[in-house]
Amino acid sequence: MSRLRLPARARPKAAAPRADGWPRAAFDDGFRVDSRLVGGFELAPLSLELMAETERDAALEGLAAFEDAIARPYLLLSVPADRPPHEHLSILEERLDGRRAAAGFSAYAALYRELCAAATRPLRRTYLLLDGASGPELGRVIATIARVAEERGLVVREVSPNEIAGIWGDVARAGVPHRIGVHTGEGDGLLTALALSRRWPAEVAPGWLAGLFAVPGIAAVAMRVRPLARAEAMGFLTTRLRQVRAAERIAAERGELADVERERLGATATDARRAVHAGSGRISFVDTVLLLEAPDRATLAERTEALRLEARSLGVDLETASFRIADAWTAILPGPAPRPIAERNLDSASLAASLLNVASDLYEPAGHLYGRARTSGAPIVLDRFAHASHNAIVLGQTGTGKTMFSGAEMHRCFLRGVRILAVDPLGDYRRLASALGGTYVELGAGDGLNPFALVGTTTERSLSAKLAMLDRLLAAMAGGLSRDERPALDRALRASYTAAGILPDPATHGRRPPTLADVVERLAAEPEGGPLARRLERWATGSLAGLFAASVPLPADRRVLVVGLAAIGDPEVRDVAQLAALSVLWDLVRADLSPKLVVVDEAWKVMRQSSGADFIEELARSARHYHAALQLATQDIVEFLRSPFGEAIVKQCDLRVLLGQTPEGADALVRFFDLTQPERRALVHARPGEGLLFVGRSHTAFEAVVSRREYAMLTTRPADLVAQSQLKCEPPDSS
């Protein structure tokens, strides 16, 4: 497909017309078509098909209000998106650092190319384009539209004159001569134009036209919208209502039965007239045209018939623009509107429901792969660090792919240069850490940590933050604190740090920190602290002393650092150790502003105690301030959502992944996320890796996918692990 790429300062000759009245395009002080300046926006896609009902209604209400605010004619244009695999892969490749990242990228790139090639529904971009006589006039209109879009929560991006020139060149097939016939245009291939008939179904679902986009060969879909002024709309509706009433009287005089279709038209006209009179809606004339292309006549006939069948299934007919192919083609081009092809009236709600920017896939090229959309097969690429909250939560039952998903997220963030910090309760990420050249610290198997150490701290507030964290940790060790024990613990902690020479001054933070045994000794010396000291004794000097008495702090400079807890047999001890590990990793997070991913598997285990839940909620709120992304995963869905902190934590996560559920878990998610019954059934019957992916206000059905290299590093299936041990080889370096 040829493209017209015009530099901003160039002044080329206008394109020669290929039919009478063909528009002329050129650069002057911007991109002009027939001397009219053209500008506009790209509209972000809306994933309506799996939005909850209330969310979908709110989105359509905002879209209707946005379109009502545009008082002049405009063009809604949907064209195929040019999204080659290298657009995303080249961005990721620039960030690779080291041999291990390069090896992982090779497998990742192969997987991504495979997904791009297997997509069943072409990706599309949707534009809202207007024209004006002068730059100041068009600029004022564009500024107004941008402001209204922001007020209504719609994401739009102003397109440059060069981009509009490229769109015009693509749709006009610039540089490729075409001979216009009765039914087709013939050049290097064949194309035809079809228009939606004026008779539409009485009721439509939001985004109902999206089904037409799945037919191969759709080169462009355009809606020419001509809003009517209030007086003009009232006159039109009054005339329409009089016609209906007159027809009803004539039918009654003839003794004919009431016509249901006529009654519907009368009721619709009455409701629309009241809405326009009250100023709560607008009437627009809309002309909808589709451009269909094919390499030969047989294929064109086949695609035309497929498009007609799809349209009939939606309750509308398609009419070929016979003898008016040039007019219909011109109607799709950016610029002033030509003569209408099959114009009909729509109210605000109907126009919003017929939106062209509907999508079921998500694409942010600076991010990384999350899976593929179930409806289109298109790869889902997201950049979590580009969202207001970088956090994510993964909810799924055992065996639904939580570990595989979280491990793949760690690996792909590593490829982007993000530092990986993780707490691994079951030892699932040991092979991943080894393959990435990271450090794996296994508590209970000879390794330990010292939660009292101040690692990488640079401010005077660091000591106060450490004392607050230790208060939570020791409360968890002791099974809670009484009203008298809390001040006693605070005094013992402060005295221990002072005795070690560590003060609020950051210059003292590198000194040897106190130990839990030091704190317990000071508690035992106080009357109020005696019972607490006895409850902490086994952690300080008893059988568990080795867990938190490491003399060397965790390495602060490792790209990948994972703390494993699988060697700790006691579940209660493991929960406390998980909280301690998180506290140490949190010190590393606050040490600098480099991008970091903090993964907490089995998060509910640490949240069962109020001190742990409070700390997780604080991490979720504060992570973005340190350029960190928190990723939580749990299988205890019902307990998590019912907890006092569960809702607050989920609200701090812009990315929410729902994998396979039990019926009880699915019911809890239906209530919490306002899911539909089809979505509930999909979660109950989901295979491993299948589920729903929420991104901000949108969500879509998706399937998580991994390369063979990632699978080898992350699988927990016993059969796979036995096979790997028998082969006695490292995970493969490429897929």
What are these regions (language model features)?
Residues 378, 386-392, 559:
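Pre-Walker A (Motif I) flank of P-loop NTPase domains
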Residues 403-453:
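Walker A/P-loop NTP-binding active-site region of P-loop NTPases
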Residues 114-117, 146-147, 161, 392, ...:
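P-loop NTPase motor core of the ASCE superfamily
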Residues 45-48, 81-84, 426-428, 446-448, ...:
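Conserved nucleotide-binding/hydrolysis micro-motifs of P-loop NTPases
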Residues 293, 321, 371-373, 382-385, ...:
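Generic beta-strand/beta-sheet core signal
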Residues 1-358:
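Extended, folded cores of ATP/NTP-driven motor/assembly subunits in large transport
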Residues 31, 41, 53-71, 213, ...:
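P-loop NTPase motor domains
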Residues 387-409:
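Glycine-rich phosphate-binding P-loop
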